[in-house]
Amino acid sequence: MRPALHHVRTALSVGVASVCLALVAGPVAAQQTVLTPEQKATIAKRNDIERQLEAIAVVDRKVMVKMRDGKRMAADVYRPKDASGKVPTIFVRTPYNFNFWDVKLGAPRDMSRQLAAVKRGYAYVDMNERGHYFSEGNYEILGAPLSDGVDAIRWMTSQPWSNGKVGTTGCSSTAEWQMAVVAQNTPGLATFNVQGFGAGVGRVGPYYEQGNWYRGGAVQMLFIDWLYKEQNQVRPVFPANLSQADLIRASKMFDLDSQPPEPDWDKAFWVLPEKDIMKSVDGPKGIFADAMDVPTGGNMIARTPNSPAWYKGGLWHDDMKIDKPGLWFMSWFDVSVSPNLAAYNHVRATASKEIADQQYAIIAPVLHCAYTRATEHTVIGDLDVGDARFDYEGLVFGWFDKFLKGVDSPIVDKQPKVMYYVMGENKWRDSPTWPPAGATTRELFLTSGGKANTLYGDGKLVDAAGGTDHPDQFLYDPANPVTTLGGGGCCQGTAVKFGSFDQNPQLARNDILVYDSEPFKEGTEVSGPITVTLYVSSDAKDTDFTFKVMDVYPDGRAFNLTENIQRMRYREGYDKPPVWMKDGEVYKVTFQPIDTSNFFFAGHKLRMAVSSSNFPRFDRNLNTGGNNYDEAKGVIAHNAVHHDAAHPSKITFTVVPRGKP
């Protein structure tokens, strides 16, 4: 239960209703609860970490840092007490709750990261993004990080204890803002470490995901759930004239975490029109479906992949040069590994020679931001990918030693430019480049007798195109889409299970086409981009096509490796007007490349499944040719995949030649 709030009044701030809370004068009694042994152990551990931190650090909490527009961002600063000189800064900026006090538990939060940084001679600065917790202003996802990020770095480097060098680190929303700010080339920002950072990548090469909002032009539905909790234009805020002591006291009294009721997303994602999903779960008004007084204007669901609004906020695009050393962490089952790899390669190709040589990447076989949760038997979904552990913390501190302190770092010196995990074989491999050095491509062509439907059909992947066209046909009904089973993703509650699962139970559906290769005669490493080209037809004006790639074991189990989708209206490009389909015509569509790494042992097969939906990982195309997001009814599409000499539908994958694993 939250403490009672007295003298509540309402104020208007930036055109948005906010509640200003006057602080109670006296202490607030915590609710009496019986602690479990686990909670008692946690409290004891955290208290010990806090004591250690206070013994070696100058602790300066709830420092309000003024931005150029006068709004103040809340920061907690930890720096070594007995430093012999000025120190470098590790900067963590986040929309999430870093408050030092766990109000519910009545104890400090886990300060082990801050303690580790101070022990190694760093200042460590936590800062909340604009419009979150104790930070002032109006929140917009990646809306104003360019100016706020630059101003924060300038503030840090101007402090008397600073050596003038700042390095950024963090995962997910704590990473996404970094790239666009790095591209501002702010003096003092010496290096960056981005982890699971796809929502910060706007446009890069063929990818127009605009911060993970799209894939192939289809909406990635993860942000509906995420924004339900995070778009907090109506929230409790404190008066602007409070002292630092007042704010510290308040931070031990008030838990400012948004705690909305958890909706039944299994039902909510089905709501039509799509723009009303937030309303259907009684979510707050905000940037998802409402026009807002923010730099990009809000109303994200109504945009298209090349809408001007995407270029007014804090996304990084490939015309923004990055010329700072970078340490990049990615994972095979994250939301967007391929745009992230494309961003890494783009920086290596466009930075100055010295900086291009200072870009390092690690690609792990884990879910979103789960790097340090790898174990001796790392299980992703139902697939055991073996011992995927790695000393990420050691590498990050070694990286900062090199680029913030200017000292030798043996761990960095021995680190390969690209380190990637090969699933199946379950081993780390390294390469000077991505795709791996020496990689070649192999093509397999789709064929069938016209009955590739289901796991039990006659679809095959063969070495040469040809034969008579017997197109494989299926019905795509938006009211009965293929539901998501595994894959890469994030943040959709219990509605979607991400990772790798045996796909066979789902492949009995008649609206899924299945194509199998012959068993591999020898072990084969497939590491790099996979590109699929299909020749398709439909009686709908617009529809989607999807594919999923699997490793089929000798016992018949088929574990998914990667997947993709393409909205047909964007098949000629996201920066071009939409193009529509005509009944009876066959169209070539090439999906954006999607990356993975897997070792196919002898006797295993490569399987590709084709359909027109993967919901609710991606939104449903209602097949009408309309806006989709504001439509309440769809139509059934009669879709087909063609494969003959004139229509060489194929999958192209990347093979790394080598001997036995």
Place the predicted regions along the sequence by residue.
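Active-site-adjacent alpha-helix of alpha/beta-hydrolase-fold enzymes
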Residues: 338-359
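Cap/lid segment of the alpha/beta-hydrolase catalytic domain
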Residues: 81-157, 204-207, 211-213, 372-383, ...
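Short beta-strand/loop motif that positions the catalytic acidic residue
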Residues: 328-330
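Alpha/beta-hydrolase fold nucleophile elbow
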Residues: 160-173
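C-terminal, loop-rich substrate-recognition/catalytic regions characterized by aromatic stacking residues
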Residues: 32-34, 240-282, 377-661
